[in-house]
Regions:
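Acyl-group handling in specialized metabolite and lipid biosynthesis
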Residues: 1, 14, 18-23, 44, ...
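A conserved beta-strand->alpha-helix junction
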Residues: 1-38, 64, 161-169
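Short beta-strand segments
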Residues: 21-23, 54, 66-67, 324
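Short low-complexity, flexible loop/linker segments enriched in glycine and/or proline
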Residues: 34-38, 59, 81-83, 272-274
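Short, polar/flexible loop-turn hinges at active-site or ligand-entry regions and domain interfaces
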Residues: 41-44, 89-93, 233-237
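Adenosyl-5′-phosphate
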Residues: 47, 60, 64-66, 117-335
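Adenylate-forming
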Residues: 47-53
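Active-site adenylate/phosphate-handling loop in enzymes that bind or generate adenylated species
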Residues: 53-113, 151, 194, 199, ...
Length: 335
């Protein structure tokens, strides 16, 4: 977006850096085959696309680059970390005998408003508060809720999956964490699963795809171990994550940079799938590799694409997941 570009240019002027810009557009969608080739597995984080472009741009000038991965996981920088703390406070204040039926009923009858601003999408929040903390946090990490995934499968695949839930791996990691505080358990699971499985895999493969060596100074084990020993109020204070890390940088960075709202490295795939790439979304239910597996209900896939295009729901990230799976199946198995 234009305001983000203006901010970056302003930062470059402040610090006298040599700033270069590359804008990712729907035309870059053709890279999806390149991504499938380099990941060699169905890797579905859509930020892989701009990560590839950034690495490509950096490689024009250097052969080694520093990455900032790891700070959010070590110092509790994600919004879900704050939500986990707030949710646990509510669970601690309201007995389960009251909380579960109360929030369960609110979650059941509150309208599902995927089209609405995030602040108004309270249905999932109510359902998470009705449940226990580990399950709620695991759900917040995922892109597609279990119930929606289940609706996509055909009957045979549902039978084969049985009681399997992808979230159970996260719940198990939190339960086994050598910690008592809920935030510590959540961060432990992030470092064990999310960081190596998503963030570092993405950075490593996209950088090596262009022969760029990416190094991770914030993952020095001494820094991560130091962060793990910090009390919760040194990681999250008020509405700010990475509290101590930001305080340490106050002598060097202006307030408007340090304390601005967190901006993820996102790709506007939801808008793309309603515009230039709407045809790609519709094709998922037709003659794609995905359709030929027999794993999914074609009508359910078609409804996902139609609801997204009409604005009834935001399935942009799910559609990207499905397309990456489709491209990976085509590449790996020739389906």
């Amino acid at each position: 977006p234009g305001n983000a570009l203006a901010q970056r240019l302003d930062h470059a002027r402040r610090f006298a850096t040599d700033h270069r810009i590359r804008i990712v557009s729907p035309d870059d969608f053709g890279l999806i085959d390149t991504l499938a080739f380099h990941f060699d597995e169905p890797f579905a984080d859509a930020s892989a696309l701009p990560t590839f472009r950034v690495c490509e741009l950096a490689r024009e000038q250097v052969t080694v680059a520093l990455s900032g991965d790891g700070a959010d996981e070590a110092f509790a920088g994600y919004r879900r970390h704050r939500f986990q703390m707030q949710g646990e406070r509510i669970r601690g204040l309201i007995p389960a005998s009251v909380r579960q039926p109360l929030f369960g009923a609110l979650g059941k009858y509150y309208p599902k408003a995927d089209w609405a601003p995030r602040a108004l999408r309270a249905k999932s929040t109510f359902l998470e508060l009705a449940g226990e903390g580990g399950a709620a946090y695991a759900a917040s990490v995922g892109v597609t809720p279990h119930a929606l995934r289940h609706r996509l499968y055909d009957q045979d695949m549902k039978s084969r999956l049985g009681a399997y839930r992808a979230e159970d791996r996260y719940i198990k990691a939190m339960a086994e964490a050598p910690a008592r505080d809920p935030l510590d358990r959540a961060q432990y699971a992030d470092i064990r699963i999310w960081l190596p499985g998503d963030i570092l895999t993405k950075t490593d493969r996209m950088s090596m795809a262009v022969s760029l060596e990416a190094r991770e100074p914030l993952l020095d084990h001494r820094l991560v171990e130091f962060a793990a020993r910090l009390p919760v109020n040194q990681r999250i204070r008020g509405n700010s994550g990475k509290y101590l890390l930001k305080k340490a940088m106050e002598p060097y960075l202006p307030q408007d940079i340090l304390y601005r709202q967190k901006m993820g490295f996102v790709t506007p795939i939801s808008a793309w799938f309603r515009g230039a790439l709407a045809g790609e979304a519709t094709a998922i239910a037709g003659g794609s590799s995905l359709a030929r597996t027999g794993w999914f209900d074609p009508k359910a896939l078609a409804k996902i694409a139609a609801d997204h295009k009409s604005g009834m729901a935001d399935h942009g990230r799910l559609l990207w997941q499905l397309l990456m799976l489709d491209k990976s199946l085509e590449r790996l198995f020739g389906i």
